[in-house]
């Protein structure tokens, strides 16, 4: 069967190509005397035949915060066992929060249409406060922290604060229900649990407090459960018991300070993600 070559529906303008990050990267490679690439195909070909040079150059060009180490790649016949930057040290949150401007970092619209905007400064300050709170709760590098959370600015703050310490983040949606959440959360033995006070579905606000209380009581490793606001009615967290605390109260004892980032090995875990669980327990 013969298929005629078709023209693309859209092509970027010359000006847009000039401003593209990939164009800037190619110019950087040329100045660094690593190659002169006329088009994307040439860059791609070089990237897969000169893997170490490509990723080392990308680290430098991207101004990655951390230490690259002296080895870019430890190859292996089985790709899953190959290691990039085996001696490197890095912190995910440090690189996310490395913005030099105070423009919007997060623009969030809930299901009802309410709009929330957080600047980079507001995001940094919130992560600073939460990091201090988590350290006070004993969270350390390598610990697991879980969330039963929807997409929201508070979820992003929690993720960044956890990763800033070098701890590992895992989450699932609150509409999973108790059984599905328990199947996942119980496996990783989190020290701290984050839960939204509720979530929105089909125009309705649904409370998340019962599932937070049930998980807190059923997972022995959980020492603290932090409830952040999403629904528009202040939540009663008394069912959670003494381990439960509102986000605002959890952060209240601390003042904003410079964040200390715990750099971890480049190949250390950042997230724990689960399979669907359709063929047994989630893995």
What name fits each language-model region?
Residues 56-69, 86-107, 267:
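A short N-terminal helical cap/helix-turn-helix that marks the beginning
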Residues 145, 162, 269, 275-278:
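Conserved S/T- and glycine-rich ATP-binding loop of Class I adenylate-forming
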Residues 102-104, 226-227, 238-274, 281:
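Conserved pre-ATP/AMP-binding loop-to-beta segment of ANL
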Residues 32-35, 93-119, 229-235:
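AMP-dependent adenylate-forming
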Residues 2-73, 77-80:
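N-terminal amphipathic, basic-rich helices that act as targeting or association modules
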Residues 41-46, 106-160, 177-182, 242-249:
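Conserved AMP-binding/adenylate-forming core of the ANL superfamily
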Residues 164-247:
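Structural core segment of the AMP-binding/adenylate-forming
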